[in-house]
Regions:
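A translation/RNA-centric and nucleic-acid-associated enzymatic feature enriched
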Residues: 1-129
């Protein structure tokens, strides 16, 4: 990610870079495969100064396609019955993303460690404020 960020800063003067179409095997089972090439997904990461700050993409909304992908990966459906039930009864097309506010803040203020941009950081040696 850092090298991608450096490249686009030098070549295009851009701090923000979208990386799209990740390999299907590297994304969660619910990520929608690209209909033009099912080895890739309709997903993205947004990098800011070489750090991933957002991940997102289109999700599978078809029950049969979702089950096909689950089976292809050899996953068990035990414990996912309620989740899968929603798809059986009809799920509209949808997508989503998640933004790492602490990561974005870290980059904006020029910190080296995300703990410095987090109000109450947690790690292996700190579980309480």
């Amino acid at each position: 990610e850092l090298l991608i960020g450096q490249y686009f800063k030098e070549e295009c003067g851009a701090d923000f870079v979208f990386v799209t179409h990740y390999p299907s095997k590297k994304r969660p089972f619910y990520a929608m495969d690209d209909p033009e090439d099912e080895t890739f997904t309709l997903s993205f990461d947004l990098l800011y100064k070489g750090l991933e700050i957002t991940t997102g993409g289109q999700r599978i909304h078809d029950y049969n396609k979702l089950m096909e992908k689950i089976n292809k990966r050899g996953m068990e459906t035990e414990g996912m019955e309620h989740y899968l039930s929603a798809f059986k009864h009809g799920m509209p097309p949808h997508g989503g993303l998640g933004i790492g506010l602490e990561r974005l803040t870290m980059q904006l203020i020029g910190e080296e460690n995300v703990r410095e941009a987090t109000l109450f950081p947690r790690d292996l040696s700190r579980l309480e404020p």
